[in-house]
């Protein structure tokens, strides 16, 4: 059965109170989740913490938190804090981001994104499960790392932002869900197939993995203005080489 959430853009023109009002309205109207991306000079965790203070039931997710800009331990700390503030309603959405943004904004070489995602999730899952982590990978080495008393009391679901076959298979192998973006209807079946293959390789039940994605809609009385707002979104993402390739296909 389909379930619905909303994405609130991290818009610096909106005040923290604006976010609280919008999220509360979504909750009252039966939406299951509120997702907030990084952007606009604001981090998503701060915005979600603000929302958590004025909501009670709606799930709160990062959509997404870029992994290149944070260490796995730092990300786990943020997730644990949000789990506490939201009373267990937090969903940790992670993504590798895109090379132009990572390199120009964060000043970090965009190298080995698949390896970085895999190791990041392995470390975070262990930390959030209350384990003492001794980890040696290709990119990270942790010794005696632990969340201690800050370990979440409930499980924090981890979603991966994915479109390509390799990342989709990793969703099936390691994650609780996938968060897709600009996924064409005729590609959706193929994408889910990649997730199922990853799950089967890992001995997991594919049906236990949540399939989620952003669908753009424009709400308004002026059809032309609504279409223009969506055209802006398409143009914005089409300027990114990664999405442009998907649009071309």
Label each residue range with its predicted role.
Residues 1-249:
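Active-site-adjacent structural elements that line small-molecule/cofactor binding pockets in enzymes
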